[in-house]
Amino acid sequence: VSHVNGANEYVEGVLNGKILANQHIVQACQRQRNDLERQGTDEFPYIFNPQMVDDGGNKYFPAERICNLISLLPHTKGKWAAKQENIQLETWQQFNLTTLFGWVHQETGLRRFREAYEEIPRKNGKSLLAAGIGHYMFALDGEHGAEVYSGATTEKQAWEVFRPARLMAKRSPDYCESKGILVNASNMAIVENGSRFEPLIGSPGDGASPSCAIIDEYHEHLTDVLVETMETGMGAREQPLLFVITTAGSNMSGPCYLKRDYAIKVLTGQFVNEQLFALIYGIDEDDDWTSETALRKANPNFGVSVGSDYLLSRQQVAMQSANRQNAFKTKHLNIWVG
């Protein structure tokens, strides 16, 4: 079964109410449906998932290719890693990936989305998804001398995405051999075309030209210096990707909340930005944060990578302890608390 079929199932389920989702996920699904209806027109020159040919003459479909790669990569922690199992994408992840990577310009074939803003609660496979995207941009995007950075303000955070990406490669010798990937202590490289994938603390140097910048837990950033430097450095790339992925936070005057506010305006149609992909999981304003429904709505991997027992017990603790409430709301329900 194709990954696009899984994505379509998810869109259908969200829009007909069978899948619990907040208004922003409904808006993202509706946006995809609207775009599919108007694709390839003068006002909207993008087409979804056409057959393409890479530099090596191989035919591929962009929406499937990203998912196929990630499905070949192994889990890096928990029960699935212990069983040496590969990643199995859920339909919400298929929607996320196929939409982000499947749209291309009808004339140039270049990717439509240059930026993604995603808010996903903790333990929903956020870093794993980011690591998989990093691998694709590093080894399969056809970018000569690709520069992929897992960027953060602290070393610990920069490694949150790079560590699983490095482990995936270490445990996939056939993949590394076929792509010529060298796995070093603190970076990965493809010698043949000069591509590299590495963690980055603070801003890249002046000579950096990122083809992909992954910014994990953006809510922790006090300023926009890192992201702005990344964006400036991307100017020389044909189809760069700035991938921002975060839980909610408490700094409502910081750059992440401003980006969120802008992304919501794109989802509601107040602003038009055809190159920004936004996916904001969470609960709606009138939802009861102490309900199981709230947990199911905010956590797309509820019962999969994030156990229902775990979430219900965290919720119970937060309900009984006022000083634990904010952490629970931001990390597990994506509620911003100022």
Report each predicted region and the residues it spans.
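Phosphate/NTP-binding elements of NTP-utilizing enzymes
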Residues: S2-G338
